[in-house]
Amino acid sequence: MNDLWELRTGRRQKIAINTRQATASLRSGTYLKMEDTPVPNGRNVVMGTYPAKHGRWSYIHCNFPNHRAAALKVLGVAEDRDAVTKAIAQWDALELEEAIIAAGGAGGMVRTMAEWAQHPQGMAIAGLPLMEIVKIADSPAEPLPKGERPLSGVRVLDLTRVIAGPTCARTLAEHGAEVLKITGKHLPSLGRQEYDTGHGKLSAHLDLREAKDVEILRGLVRKADVFSQGYRPGTLGNRGFTPEALAQLRPGIVVVSLCAFSHAGPWASRRGFDTVVQTVSGITHRQGEVFPGAVPGPQFYPVSAIDFLTGYLMAFGASVALARRTREGGSWLVRISLAQVGRWLVQRGEVPAAELTNVAKEFTPEELERWKMTSNTPVGRLQHLAPVVQMSETPAYWDKPTVPLGYHQPVWPAQTS
C-alpha cells in the first residue's frame, strides 16, 4: 500500500502494526457479535479428526452440506458423531481419503511432515515459491485512478468463498478499493464467515451456469482492475474466464488466483481448506505432539493462520501487480495456494518449548475492546475487529458495512472523476 501511495503522491507513510492485534485477526470470527450476541461458529458436529485403522487418523471436512453428505455416504452412517467414530475406525485412513475425495467430499489422512515431504504433491509444492506474480499479456501502463486513498478507484471483483479469498478483497477494501463480491445463490455459505469477511463490499448474485449471467460477468470484468477467484483450477476457465481470456476482455487486469494445492502436482484439482492442508501436510500431527489435547491425537492451529495469511498475501500480491501495471503496463497473474502458504508457515520455525508454558488462551478484555468497532448492517448492529494496519496519512477503514449475500445488483457504481 505504501508503494501505491508513493506512486500517487511521491510520499511514503509511516506504518504501524500491533502484533497482538494482528494475531487476533487470525481468529477474527471468534469476536463477532450481532446485537451483543455472539455469532455462532456454524461448525458441524461430525467435522473433525477420528482414529482409523492401524493407528492412523482421518479428518473429514463437513461444514458445507455437499461435503458432509459425501463423507456420510461413503461411511454409510447418519449425521451422528458416535456413528462416524465407529465407521472410521473400520477404515484404512488412506483408502478413506481417496474414497471421500472420489465422492466429492473433502478431508484427508493425517500425515507426518516427513511423509508429506515424500508425497508427490508435497514435492510439487516444495518446488514452488510462496506465490508467483507473472506478466501474462502486454498492455499500456495505466496510472492509478484519482482518489485520496492508496486504492481509491480500483475496482475489484471478488469471486471467492470461505476465508482466504474474501479476506484478500476485504483487505483491499479497507484501503479504498471498490469491491463487488459475486457468488451464486445456489451455492452454500457459512454465515459467520460472511459477516467477518464482508466489510467494505458490495455483494451480488450471478449464476454462471446461465449464459446471460456469464455475459453480465464479462461486462463487469471489462470495467474491473482486479479479478480475484478461489475456485479449483479449471472451474472458471471452463466458463471462459481463464487468466488469458480475462486479459483479452480487459487488457491491464490483475488476476489473483487461489486454490488449495497449487496448479502443480497430482492434487492440482483437489478441493481443500485450511484444515485439510494442515491435516495432510503434517501440521496437525506436529501440533498434537507439541500441544497434546485432552485426548491424544492430532491438533489444529488455534487460529485459522493459513486461511488469513493467504488472504493477506493475496492482497499484497494484487498491490504489487497494480504497481507494476502502473510502472510498466501489462496484465498480471498472482498465483498462490493454501498449501504453499502452509509450507511457508512451517518454514518460519517453531517457538522454543520454554516459551510455550503458561501461554494465555485469550487476549485481555481491555485489548479486545480497543481493537473492536461496531457497524450498522442491514440485519443489525455488528461488533467486529477493526483493521490492523495503521497508516499515518490514510487510516484504514471500510466505507460500507457487511451485507447479506446478493444484497446488491451486479453493476459497478458510477465513479466520480
Regions found by a protein language model. Give the residues of each.
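Acyl-CoA thioester-binding alpha/beta core of soluble enzymes
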Residues: 1-186, 214, 218, 222-223, ...
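Rossmann-fold NAD(P)-binding glycine/threonine-rich loop
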Residues: 238-285
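Domain-scale recognition of functional cores that engage charged ligands
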Residues: 166-167, 177, 192, 206-208, ...
